[in-house]
Each structure stands twice: as C-alpha cells, then as structure tokens.
Amino acid sequence: MVAASGTQRTRTVGLARWIVYAGSVFAGAWLATQLFYLVQIALWSFINPGSTAFMRTDAWWLSHDKPPAQIQHQWVPYDQISRNLKRALIASEDATFATNNGYDVDAILQAWEKNKARGHIVAGGSTITQQLARNLFLSREKSYIRKGQELIITWMLETVLDKERIFEIYLNSVEWGRGVYGAEAAARYYYRIPASRLGAWQSARLAVMLPKPRWFDAHRGSAYQAQRAAVIARRMGAAELPQSQ
C-alpha cells in the first residue's frame, strides 16, 4: 500500500509538472505573438504595410484561379484620398471614430445580444480600428477567441498610432471585392478614376459595400445599395474626420 501510494504521488507530481510546463510554453508563445504584433504596429508609424493577412490569403487563392489572378492594390497617401470617401466611411462604419478609443461598447453589447439570440456569431460591433486589426493580422473566421485577439490588437493600434494614421492604413487596406484592396484600387476598379476624384455619391456607394464587398461586387446596382447610399450621403456632412497629432 505504501509503495502504491508513493507511485500515485509520483504520477501526480509528474502530471502537475507537465501541466506547468505546457502552460509556460503556451504563455510564452502567446506573449511572443503579442510582441510581434506590437513591433509590427510600431514600425507602421513610419513604414506602410506591404500587405495584410486578408490580402495574403486572397493572393494564394487568386494564384490558383484559371487563369491565375493577382491582388489589385496601390498605396496612396492620406491626402490623395477624397474627403468624400473618408466622410462616407465614418458615417457608415464608425460615427465616433475621431473621438472614441477604438471600441464602441454599446455596439459590442448589441452584437452580443444578437449573437446570443441567433445561437452563433453573426455580428461583431466592430469600429474602424477593430476592422483594421482583423484585416492586418487575423482571419475571416468568426469566433470569440479571434474577437478577443482583435480587441487586444485594437488597443495596440490606438496606443501606438494616431487616428489619422490608423485611418490612412485602413483606407489603403480594406477589402472592396475579391482581390480588390484599398481606396485607390476600388476607385479604379469600379469608377476608373483615382481615389482623389471620388464624388459624394460614388463614395457613399463604396461605403455601403464594406460589410459584404464580394456580394455587392457581384450584385452591382442593387436597390439596397442605392437606398443605403442615400442614407450615408445625408450623414456625410456631420462626419468628423480625425486630426493628425
């Protein structure tokens, strides 16, 4: 009995050590990942991102098309993007972007209630900064784990970058259709003009597309797009643009 008891204690101690070791490895890997994100964001204070997680995933799929296709993306400076588009996106996606801290608590709570009622994730209540966090580093998968990581990256973005820089990166990286990324590519793809020349109505229609850009690309001129664009156009005058610091 004594020998059996000793063996049991040895096994228990061994299991505890293994759990501590595994936990330490997991924690170390998690911290290393967060540090990687933070360093990347710090570099983007003065270096433009070459691509995003969404772009890289799309590029892989497009390369397997027949015939192979490529990502459409061209970075342009903030002041070369129409103020109409900036106002339309803020009016549509995040009315308090210029003054919030990257989170809209009311929208998050509303999304939580909606998801609970549906039994699965259908809404995220994401601000512009949260959308950027997801586009830069994460996947299109909808899960609470991914949402948690999105919130952490959002805090990093808001802490390290000013609002205008966040918006500049967002404008240059958001998806506007399969393989179409950024304001310049979208303006040329849909209207054959540079982003600097986008008018109010064109900008409002582009803003409507963001929740489901691929669907709207395939269903151009839908009645809903026109109706929603009219609502956004009316709100654009009140949209507050961020100021550089």
Swiss-Prot record:
InterPro entries linked: Glyco_trans_51, Lysozyme-like_dom_sf, PBP_transglycosylase, Pep_trsgly
Metabolic or biological pathway: Cell wall biogenesis; peptidoglycan biosynthesis
Keywords for this protein: Cell inner membrane, Cell membrane, Cell shape, Cell wall biogenesis/degradation, Glycosyltransferase, Membrane, Peptidoglycan synthesis, Transferase, Transmembrane, Transmembrane helix
Location of the protein in the cell: Cell inner membrane
Gene Ontology cellular component list: peptidoglycan-based cell wall; plasma membrane
Keyword Cell wall biogenesis/degradation: yes
N-terminal signal peptide: none
Topology with respect to the bilayer: Single-pass membrane protein
Major localization listed first in the record, in broad terms: membrane
Pfam families: Transgly (PF00912)
GO-annotated biological processes: cell wall organization; peptidoglycan biosynthetic process; regulation of cell shape
Protein name: Biosynthetic peptidoglycan transglycosylase
